[in-house]
């Protein structure tokens, strides 16, 4: 800018420099005065003098961020600004608003950075948190900073460990349909109310046997389970952390199925409630559908198939339990298939092939054990998606054992095959090739019998028939079951009744949902409050020993292996701190030596309950005070689920964080620790801010800010480049940060731009060049109040003219409706309309200026505070009353009708708002008389308040 041009700028214009000064000053004032502190009903955060003490409460919650080293780009704060606008509006509307921000700071990225650099993950994470706090403060977010938490702080994860212990020391009573303390289960066993699994009295069981019985009921338990082992990362991954092609989401390493001892959470016990209570939530339907599908409730029957037990008489005769949604097809079950990892396989495999075993069944091996071992090795290298692909050729091996079909009495061979997954159902299926396409394909490969049990529809010429029809080939009168001629529903019911009566099975509900893998072989996570005694039994530490703090270690990394080494075993970083692992404790029966659990909790642990800690963050005696929880999150009335009033975050958390948090919250509810049975009453998914990236002829990304558009093409200098649309990222060289925008225009402009880009729930492209439009809007708001030349107020106490007053109240009415519905973009559009009208006036009437500033405040709070102060108000507008429209001024005095002749607008007519249809018709015909050329119109249609259509 030239000196002459600079001198032309009025001295009191709203500029980026002035915005910076105003914003920093008001941020300091808010912090110093505790402007956004929300009072609790009791305790140290109570404040009976607060302007909203005793008011209707509102709890607004953001999904708290993981503080990465890259800091925020302009896409990250979209939801935070949206919730801030909503919270500011609600505060001005008279509510006591709790809005806080914390940090989800444990996790793999910080640990991997520590491994690469040798810097302790706490050092980098705390530095990242400090940077995030500075960036968020610069945006003017109205958080109650007293309530900020970080999951890595011992004062926080002490309570994460406490919640874990509540879950560990609880069991799910299926009759009562709720969790109960484990002590009540033990009392039922010891009092004879509940039978032990083998029928022996409780008093006859040893301590080890009693522990074993109780552990089978616990909601948190250790299990030898098929898990996703990633040698390249040296850790076990949850299903959700594995990509569809069977690789780790982090690092892109191959992942293998292995049986390993891990901590699990019995989330499946809550399958029905997690599913049914979705109907009580105000959530987007796509998110509900994703959870319903993830839980995957299926109604059918468990059927037990007796077997011979390999060569081991000690095992007895184990039964293979299968779950099927079609028990009516049992007459067509001609073989069984087990997942290669199924726990019974090793018990069933004999040393030699039975007489008459077909060569095609053996996998080319000399013995069943060799065949099983070889097949397992091949299956372990495949992803679940590869194993279940419909197009792949079916493979498997006979394990050398047979089962008995309980209804036909036939001996049917048992195979293992990779298309059956250990983690789904029971890990075993009864194969009915006549009614299942995959079973048909397998039967064809291995030349197995095919029996149809449902009559195909007329004209059917396919293979497996999966449709409806009467039962056929389904009679065993000697066993008391005849299904022939019955429809599917009746046949299913009759079969289930027979199974239960004969002791061969029972009706059942199963879920696609699996128990939650809850341990990680990492360093940077919450330690478990668990030790092991000399027998290897897990023992929960008492609450007065919490927190179990994460110790310092020299090497943060788990031992990693060749990414292809599926047979490797986990070795955790904590296991190398022997002075921490091996500990002497007095747990009530004198000092003894114990071994600490060396796995850590997954990154999801802290986020499962953090919304509760915001309520009472300084409480050293409870994770949350009951009265405080009831005030902020309690049910509103009969049947209400309770929870936060608004939760805003990305849809990508639909089946991870959101499901896990619901599970933890329901356990806490069952045990009486919270009054709400859902954590998040209303969920809103914000869209994403995306960006254009540009590549040169080599495919290399070039700086997006240096690219210019000419004649529909894009150039870096004189070189044409290609444009693509998607994410922002450092590697894409298209990152724009909030810091840059605040420096160039101010935080208020950045906030207004993000809220005006489109509906909050819709993704949209970032356009740096368009930000100036929001800046100019705020300049016009400033000019409506402040004289740019003198700095004097342009606000006058003279009344507004009728048109301006009516416009104001129409805008107020529209903005209030938009703010309640979080339609922020249309709110901004209305404010622009009002501001543009004011700039045409010689001075701004106070009765319009003050409502304008109050309505601008949620979006541009700093400049609004400054203008409010300049208009003579000594206190912050944060608790000023949001404008309310006068209903009398919302009634239009006149209406303008466009008049169409044969579909084209030929004129307009203004008539009184209460004009009759005859008056409107006459005025419209008069207005288009020239277009009618003296002819009588064939038809005149008056759409009240909208338009007039004339057909000539």
Curated annotation (Swiss-Prot):
Q: One GO CC annotation, please?
A: cytosol
What keywords are annotated for this sequence in UniProt? Answer: Aminoacyl-tRNA synthetase, ATP-binding, Cytoplasm, Ligase, Nucleotide-binding, Protein biosynthesis
Predominant subcellular localization, coarse grouping: cytoplasm
Q: Which GO terms describe its molecular function?
A: aminoacyl-tRNA deacylase activity; ATP binding; leucine-tRNA ligase activity
Tell me which EC number(s) this protein carries. 6.1.1.4
The keyword Ligase belongs to this UniProt entry's keyword annotation: yes
| Catalysed reaction, written as an equation | tRNA(Leu) + L-leucine + ATP = L-leucyl-tRNA(Leu) + AMP + diphosphate
Query: Biological process (GO) annotations?
Result: leucyl-tRNA aminoacylation
Q: Which Gene3D superfamilies match?
A: HUPs (3.40.50.620), Isoleucyl-tRNA Synthetase, Domain 1 (1.10.730.10), Valyl/Leucyl/Isoleucyl-tRNA synthetase, editing domain (3.90.740.10)
The cross-references to InterPro entries, in alphabetical order and at most eight, read: aa-tRNA-synth_I_CS (IPR001412), G2_nidogen/fibulin_G2F (IPR006605), Leu-tRNA-ligase (IPR002302), Leu_tRNA-synth_edit (IPR025709), M/V/L/I-tRNA-synth_anticd-bd (IPR013155), Methionyl/Leucyl_tRNA_Synth (IPR015413), Rossmann-like_a/b/a_fold (IPR014729), tRNAsynth_Ia_anticodon-bd (IPR009080)
Q: Name one Pfam family in it.
A: Anticodon_1
Binding locations of ATP = 730
Where in or outside the cell it occurs: the entry states: Cytoplasm
The sequence motif named 'HIGH' region is recorded at 65-76
Instruction: Find motif ('KMSKS' region) and give its ranges.
Output: 727-731
Please report which protein family the annotation says this sequence is part of.
Belongs to the class-I aminoacyl-tRNA synthetase family.
Q: Under which name does UniProt file this protein?
A: Leucine--tRNA ligase
């Amino acid at each position: 800018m030239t000196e002459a041009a600079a001198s032309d700028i009025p001295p009191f214009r709203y500029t980026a420099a002035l915005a910076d000064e105003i914003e920093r000053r008001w941020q300091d004032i808010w912090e110093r005065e505790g402007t956004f502190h929300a009072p609790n009903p009791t305790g140290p955060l109570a404040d009976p003098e607060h302007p909203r003490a005793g008011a209707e409460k509102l709890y607004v919650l953001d999904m708290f961020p993981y503080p990465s080293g890259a800091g925020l780009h302009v896409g990250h704060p979209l939801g935070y600004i949206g919730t801030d606008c909503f919270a500011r509006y609600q505060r001005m509307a008279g509510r006591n608003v709790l809005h806080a921000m914390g940090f989800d700071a444990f996790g793999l990225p910080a640990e991997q950075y520590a491994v690469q650099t040798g810097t302790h993950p706490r050092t980098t994470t705390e530095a990242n948190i400090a940077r995030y706090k500075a960036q968020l403060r610069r945006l003017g977010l109205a958080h109650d900073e007293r309530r900020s938490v970080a999951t890595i702080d011992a004062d926080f994860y002490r309570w994460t460990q406490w919640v874990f212990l509540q879950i560990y020391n609880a069991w799910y009573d299926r009759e009562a349909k709720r969790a109960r303390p484990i002590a009540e289960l033990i009392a039922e066993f010891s009092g004879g109310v509940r039978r032990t699994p083998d029928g022996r009295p409780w008093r006859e069981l040893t301590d080890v046997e009693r522990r074993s019985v109780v552990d089978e009921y616990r909601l948190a338990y250790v299990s030898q389970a098929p898990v996703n082992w990633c040698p390249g990362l040296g850790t076990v991954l949850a299903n959700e952390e594995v990509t569809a092609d069977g690789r780790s989401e982090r690092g892109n390493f191959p992942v293998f199925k292995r049986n390993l001892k891990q901590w699990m959470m019995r989330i499946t016990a809550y399958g029905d409630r997690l599913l049914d209570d979705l109907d009580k939530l105000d959530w987007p339907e796509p998110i509900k559908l994703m959870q319903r599908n993830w839980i995957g409730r299926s109604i059918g029957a468990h059927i037990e198939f007796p077997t011979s037990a390999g060569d081991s008489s000690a095992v007895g005769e184990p039964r293979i339990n299968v779950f099927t949604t079609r028990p009516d097809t049992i007459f067509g079950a001609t073989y069984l298939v087990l997942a290669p990892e199924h726990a019974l396989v090793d018990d069933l495999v004999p040393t030699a092939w039975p007489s008459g075993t077909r060569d095609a069944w053996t996998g080319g091996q000399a013995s069943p054990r060799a065949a099983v071992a070889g097949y397992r090795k091949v299956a372990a290298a495949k992803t679940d998606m590869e194993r279940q692909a419909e197009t792949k050729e079916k493979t498997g091996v006979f394990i050398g054992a047979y089962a008995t079909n309980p209804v036909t009495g036939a001996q049917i061979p048992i195979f293992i095959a990779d298309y059956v997954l250990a983690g789904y159902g029971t890990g075993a299926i009864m194969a009915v090739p006549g009614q299942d396409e995959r079973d048909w394909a397998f039967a064809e490969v291995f030349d197995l019998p095919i029996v149809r049990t449902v009559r195909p529809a007329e004209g059917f010429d396919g293979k497996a028939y999966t449709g409806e029809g009467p039962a056929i080939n389904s009679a065993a009168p000697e066993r008391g079951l005849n299904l022939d001629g019955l429809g599917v529903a009746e046949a299913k019911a009759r079969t289930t009744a027979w199974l239960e009566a004969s002791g061969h099975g029972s009706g059942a509900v199963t879920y696609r949902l699996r128990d939650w893998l809850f341990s990680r072989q990492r360093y940077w996570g919450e330690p478990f409050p668990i030790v092991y005694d000399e027998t290897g039994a897990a023992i929960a530490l008492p609450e007065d020993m919490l927190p179990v703090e994460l110790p310092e270690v020299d090497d943060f990394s788990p031992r990693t292996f060749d990414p292809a080494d599926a047979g490797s075993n986990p070795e955790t970083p904590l296991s190398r701190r022997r002075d921490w692992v091996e500990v002497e404790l007095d747990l009530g029966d004198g000092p003894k030596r114990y071994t600490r659990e060396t796995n850590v909790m997954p990154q999801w642990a802290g986020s499962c309950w953090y919304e509760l800690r915001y309520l009472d963050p300084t409480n050293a005696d409870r994770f949350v005070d009951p009265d405080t929880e009831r005030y902020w999150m309690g049910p509103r009335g009969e049947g209400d689920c309770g929870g936060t009033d608004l939760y805003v975050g990305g849809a990508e958390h639909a089946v991870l964080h959101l499901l896990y948090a619901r599970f933890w919250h329901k356990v806490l509810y069952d045990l009486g620790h919270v009054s709400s049975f859902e954590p998040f009453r209303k969920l809103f998914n914000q869209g994403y801010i995306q960006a254009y990236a540009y590549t040169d002829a080599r495919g290399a990304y070039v700086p997006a800010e240096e690219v210019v558009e000419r004649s529909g093409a894009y150039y870096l200098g004189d070189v044409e480049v290609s444009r693509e649309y998607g994410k922002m990222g450092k590697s894409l060289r298209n990152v724009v940060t909030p810091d840059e925008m605040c420096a160039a225009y101010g935080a208020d402009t950045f906030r207004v731009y993000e809220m005006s880009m489109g509906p909050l729930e819709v993704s949209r492209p970032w356009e740096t060049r368009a930000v100036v439009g929001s800046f100019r809007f705020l300049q016009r708001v400033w000019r409506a109040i402040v004289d740019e030349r003198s700095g004097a107020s342009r606000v006058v106490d003279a009344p507004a003219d009728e048109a301006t007053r009516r416009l104001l109240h129409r805008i107020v009415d529209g903005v209030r409706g938009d703010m309640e519905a979080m339609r922020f973009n249309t709110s901004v559009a209305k404010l622009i309309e009002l501001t543009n009208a004011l700039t045409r006036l010689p001075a701004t009437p106070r009765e319009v200026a003050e409502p304008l500033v109050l309505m601008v405040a949620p979006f541009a709070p700093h400049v609004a505070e400054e203008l409010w102060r300049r208009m003579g108000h000594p206190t912050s507008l944060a608790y000023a009353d949001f404008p309310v429209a006068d209903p009398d001024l919302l009634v239009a005095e006149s209406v303008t009708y466009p008049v169409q002749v044969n579909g084209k607008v030929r004129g307009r007519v203004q008539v009184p708002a209460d004009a009759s249809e005859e008056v409107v018709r006459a005025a419209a015909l008069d207005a288009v008389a020239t277009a009618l050329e003296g002819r009588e119109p064939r038809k005149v249609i008056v759409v009240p308040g909208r338009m007039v259509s004339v057909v000539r």
